[in-house]
C-alpha cells in the first residue's frame, strides 16, 4: 500500500481530523540517512506529523518546518513539508544508540532530551509564522499536542508511531491528528477524550492492518465521519545540482576564489536527503563567472 493521508470532518464539522500511513516515507528516510532504530523512530514520527501538518496549509507554495531542538544525543530533528504531501527531514546524529526505555521500547524521549519544539510556517507573507513551545516529553506526539493547545489554541489529539523489523527496516509508520473546533459542544469533546484514552497505540493498530480511514474510525468511534480528501505522501527532496550551484554563487567571489585556489574538487552534501554533489575546479570557475 502506497503512503497516503486522509482529511476528514466529524460531528457536523465540530471535529477536523487527519490520518496517515507513512511506512514507505519513513523507510526511504532510513535508507537515505542510514539511521539507527531510535533515530528512525524519532525522525519517522516527526515526518509523519509534518506530512499531515503540511496538508493543513492552503497555498501551493506554503512550506512548513518542524524543528525539535533538544540536548539529547540525537542532536535535534528537522522536517520540512509542503501542502501536497511531500516531506523530507534529517536528524543531527543518525547513528545514535541508547538503551531501551522502562517499557522495553525505543527511547525516543531519551534520545531527544530536554529542549524546544519550533513550528515555522512560510506562507509567502513578509514574515513567516513561528511558534515555539518547551518539549513536554520528547516523544513528539505529546509535544505536538501541547504545541497545538498552547501556541495555536486548538485542542488536539496527536498519535504517532513507528515500528521496526528485526533487521532495522521500517515495519509500520503512521499517525493521526484530531482537532476540536471552537464551536464544539462539551459532549463532543468529552466523547473524543474518552476515545483517545481507550484507543490502542498507532503501531498496534497499523500492525492489525488499519488504514488511515480505519484509524480515524477508531479515534472517532461513535461520530459520523466524512472523508474529504485523500492525498499521496512521500519522502521527497527538491535538491539538485543547479540549486546547490545557486548556493555556491551566494557565498560570493572571495570564498569561491579561495576554493578554486585550493585546486581540489568540492563536495557539498544535502542535509535533507544525504545526496552529495561534486564540483570540479573548472565548474567552480564557471560559477565564479556567473557571480556579480
Language model segments and positions:
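Cys/His-clustered metal-coordination modules, chiefly Zn-binding fingers
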Residues: 197-292
Amino acid at each position: 500500500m502506497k503512503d497516503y493521508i486522509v482529511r476528514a470532518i466529524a460531528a457536523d464539522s465540530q471535529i477536523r481530523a487527519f490520518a496517515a500511513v507513512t511506512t514507505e516515507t519513513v523507510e526511504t528516510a532510513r535508507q537515505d540517512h542510514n539511521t539507527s532504530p531510535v533515530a528512525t523512530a524519532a525522525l519517522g514520527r516527526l515526518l509523519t506529523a509534518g506530512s499531515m501538518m503540511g496538508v493543513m496549509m492552503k497555498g501551493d507554495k506554503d512550506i512548513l518546518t518542524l524543528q525539535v531542538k533538544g540536548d539529547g544525543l540525537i542532536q535535534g530533528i528537522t522536517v520540512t513539508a509542503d501542502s501536497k504531501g511531500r516531506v523530507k527531514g534529517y536528524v543531527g546524529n543518525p547513528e545514535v544508540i541508547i538503551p531501551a526505555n522502562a517499557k522495553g521500547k525505543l527511547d525516543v524521549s531519551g534520545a531527544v532530551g530536554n529542549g524546544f519544539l519550533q513550528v515555522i510556517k512560510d506562507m509567502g507573507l513578509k514574515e513567516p509564522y513561528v511558534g515555539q513551545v518547551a518539549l513536554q516529553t520528547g516523544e513528539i506526539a505529546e509535544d505536538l499536542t501541547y504545541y497545538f493547545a498552547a501556541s495555536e489554541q486548538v485542542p488536539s489529539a496527536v498519535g504517532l508511531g513507528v515500528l521496526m523489523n528485526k533487521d532495522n527496516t521500517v515495519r509500520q509508520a503512521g499517525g493521526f491528528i484530531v482537532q476540536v473546533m471552537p464551536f464544539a459542544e462539551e459532549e463532543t469533546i468529552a466523547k473524543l477524550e474518552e476515545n483517545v484514552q481507550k484507543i490502542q497505540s498507532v503501531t498496534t493498530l497499523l500492525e492489525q492492518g488499519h488504514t488511515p480511514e480505519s484509524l480515524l474510525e477508531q479515534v472517532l468511534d461513535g461520530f459520523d465521519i466524512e472523508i474529504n480528501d485523500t492525498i499521496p505522501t512521500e519522502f521527497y527532496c527538491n535538491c539538485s545540482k543547479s540549486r546547490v550551484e545557486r548556493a555556491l554563487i551566494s557565498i560570493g567571489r572571495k570564498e569561491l576564489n579561495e576554493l578554486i585556489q585550493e585546486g581540489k574538487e568540492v563536495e557539498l552534501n544535502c542535509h535533507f536527503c544525504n545526496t552529495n554533489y561534486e564540483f570540479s575546479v573548472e565548474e567552480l570557475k564557471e560559477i565564479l563567472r556567473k557571480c556579480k
